[in-house]
């Protein structure tokens, strides 16, 4: 994502949202051959996409069979879907982990206030076993950023959880 968008998206209002989304659609179309191919297959292009409702969404199955990336880059990290037994997991390649972290932290703080005002308690049984789960990554980062010693993962630690909550 070009630098101007990374700063623009965090201060966007409802009026500017649609225009920015259309700009990002055009960028994706121009710089992601897989996405452009899909958009063309469903008869969508910058010539006929004029509103949010016109923007085509890439099906999840593409994330299982392709490396979905806009421009060429080495990813900082990738996340995998949980999937089910015997299936191929989808992958989400992250170009800039700092931008990813800024995004979910700003989203949290926009809804709940400063992270330092919160204890973050993670109860994520099946996710903790997945080494590339985005939810575990996000919760771990929120735990770290909260700065509270009582923040943490409490899977199977019911006594400790009870004490923390009381």
Question: How does the language model describe each region?
Answer:
Residues 1-80, 86-116, 121-122, 126, ...:
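Nucleotide 5′-phosphate-binding alpha/beta core
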Residues 134-138:
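Extended acidic/charged loop-beta regions that coordinate divalent cations
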């Amino acid at each position: 994502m070009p630098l101007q968008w990374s700063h623009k998206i965090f201060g966007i209002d409802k009026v500017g949202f649609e225009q920015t989304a259309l700009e990002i659609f055009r960028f994706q179309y121009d710089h992601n051959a897989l996405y452009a191919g899909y958009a063309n297959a469903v008869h969508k292009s910058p010539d006929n996409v004029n509103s949010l409702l016109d923007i085509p969404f890439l099906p999840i199955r593409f994330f299982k069979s392709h490396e979905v990336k806009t421009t060429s880059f080495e990813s900082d990290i990738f996340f995998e879907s949980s999937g089910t037994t015997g299936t191929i997991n989808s992958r989400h390649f992250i170009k800039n982990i700092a931008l990813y972290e800024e995004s979910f932290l700003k989203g949290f703080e926009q809804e709940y206030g400063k992270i330092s005002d919160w204890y973050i308690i993670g109860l994520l049984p099946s996710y903790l076993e997945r080494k590339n789960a985005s939810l575990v990554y996000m919760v771990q980062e929120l735990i770290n950023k909260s700065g509270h010693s009582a923040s943490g993962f409490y899977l199977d630690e019911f006594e400790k959880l009870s004490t923390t909550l009381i």
